[in-house]
Amino acid sequence: MTDEEKQIEKKRRGLDMSYPGWWLKLFVGDMGISVRDGERVAAKMWHHLSNTLKLTFGSLAISFLIAASIGFWAAFRPGSRLSRFTIFSISVFSCVPIFLLGLFISLLYQRSLRSFPQGSVACLLALLTLGFGDGTISEMARHLSDSAGKLLSEDFMIAVRARNVGIGRHFRRNMLIPVLDIVSSRFALLISATVVVEYVFNYRGIGWLTLNSIQTEHGLRDYPVIMATTLAMVTIIALMRLGCALIHPVVDRRLE
């Protein structure tokens, strides 16, 4: 390929564009063209992004249900051996590196779970691996247990319980802030952890796309895709944080 042909190819793929120029085109929805296959980056990214959001929110929902059940159960039994052992057990289990846990569960699936539909089981295994391996369930369980324990020891809660009045309404209202805090903080970590889980399970999400674009193919890295996927993940995390910050005053009027 001659130098002139190289320049034409660079211009066609947008490799000669400056960084400010990339931002200007981004404002009109143009993220450029993939260096490897010539496909529009926006169309390529949104398909993978939807898969990652399903994985992340699915894992967050499953992790929260398990962690809330364990955490609130432990809070109503402070100091009991069983509650302490349960919290300790999930903490130890979550210390296993996420890539090692993913490989182990993948091997278990290949050996023992072949009779189940592959798509649904593989997706569920990825969700649980992401939740446990990233420490989300153990962190949520400890945080919710501590927050609920402190709430139950407050004077007004002791007075409510002494009157044999249901504490459900007071408990739910005062636990919303701790729940929002832990959910928003773990969401960012889950997004980053999807890179490992998607690679282990060959799940075509944005983490898999980013890692695949970073790997050199024919001496090329797909920089337009890398820039777009990185920006997308940062934007999602920022919007999640902003949403939680805006919800706080609505949930707790004392913050207004």
Language model features by range: what are they?
Residues 10-64, 68:
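An internal, D/E-rich "acidic patch" concept
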Residues 88-117, 131-133:
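Membrane-water interface segments at the C-terminal ends of transmembrane alpha-helices
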Residues 49-82, 98, 117-256:
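Alpha-helical transmembrane segments of integral membrane proteins
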Residues 1-20, 109, 113-124:
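Hydrophobic alpha-helical transmembrane segments of membrane transport/permease proteins
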